[in-house]
Amino acid sequence: RIGGNIQVEEGDYNFNNTITAMGYSPIDPSHRYALTYSGNFYYSSNNGHSWTMSSGFTGPGSHYFYGAKILPSKVELGKVIIAGSGYSNPPVFISSNHGGSFSSMSHGIPNTLVFDLASTESDNFIFAATAVGAFAFSTEGEVWEDIMGFEGPDQTYWTVEYVSEIYSARFGTYGRGIWDFIINDDPIISGDINQDTIVNIQDLILLVNFILG
């Protein structure tokens, strides 16, 4: 983008399939990522001028019209999380080397479609919008937890974004509106809520119960 004008440059790389997700590192935008309909993952370190396909890895497929998701880390260059269809394979994978290799990041999340991902500014919590509800992942506990509680609608959650100004993960649902999951806007209750000496997803679950009453 130059001023009020947006310039478009078409790349000439042939991915041999439909692109279902794209992303780039917010730390270094020259690192770009792409996921195809067949689950092939590609990464580039030179602004997309050349691409490398992850060897020996088939990632999650995508929803037939919605696509998949790539979430590059905001704090760790090379860390990339991808998500999509998880009925015959894990729905979420993570890489620490730009996609050179991946491992499953699906402990605690059911076999389902993951439509969208979002993270806090420090990446300590990852949020997932899925076909069966809203989930959160703590880097301390390393497990996904259902965060719908008793108030969240039992519905498909299509989108999620993290709104740092109000410490909230904002989810969009199918026909049931937009729901904010507030992490913390009061320093008095930040941190180790259950006093087990560890700040993890259990503290997050307690916090949402406090908010919902």
List the predicted regions and their residue ranges:
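Surface-exposed or flexible loop/turn and strand-edge residues in extracellular/cell-surface modules
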Residues: 77, 188-190, 202
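Alpha-helical segments with a strong preference for the paired helices of cellulosomal dockerin domains
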Residues: 193-213
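Extracellular glycan-interacting surfaces
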Residues: 1-186
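Glycine-rich, flexible loop/turn motifs
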Residues: 105, 189, 208
